[in-house]
Amino acid sequence: MKHKLFFLILAGILMTGNALADNQIKSAMSAAPASVSANAKVIDWNFKTLREGNNGWTCLPDRPDTPGNDPWCVNEPWLNFLNAYVKKEKPTYTEIGFAYMLMGDTPVSNNDPYATEPTSKEDWVTDLGAHLMMLIPNTDMLKNISTDHLNGGPWIMWPDTPYAHIMLPLENRQ
């Protein structure tokens, strides 16, 4: 009887873990069009593989510890960027990077990659819906692009940092 109870508990734990992984995979896949996410690798925010992929894209689920719904689908340069960002190191990508965030984002500083508290309206990005992001290895090429997230079009987020990238909103913003 004790063995049956043990196996029932173990089976319940395993099913709960599988359901959590399934939810994370579904969340991650919502970040990009199905043409990208259907065959993408899916990892969690500890960079543990939840599902293998075969198209060069990697998707990550919404981060439950942040406000907003913010899953990502990224190519290899963005994966390099995210690994460096998490470790507070300089990214080493050498190719153009693309990232999809079709579900939106969490509120974030436009200037300070590690800010955790809201700042001024001119800095704090709160209403960002679906968007794409681009990395350019030579960030000197970004100098003539606006850094104003309220300009109505593309802008540079985190300018003058190793994490500078182009934000491309896909929805109207106020």
Regions found by a protein language model. Give the residues of each.
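Primary mode marks residue(s) on the alpha4-beta5-alpha5 output face of response regulator receiver
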Residues: D22-Q174
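Sec-dependent N-terminal signal peptides
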Residues: L5-I13
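N-terminal secretory signal peptides that target proteins for export/translocation
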Residues: M1-K2
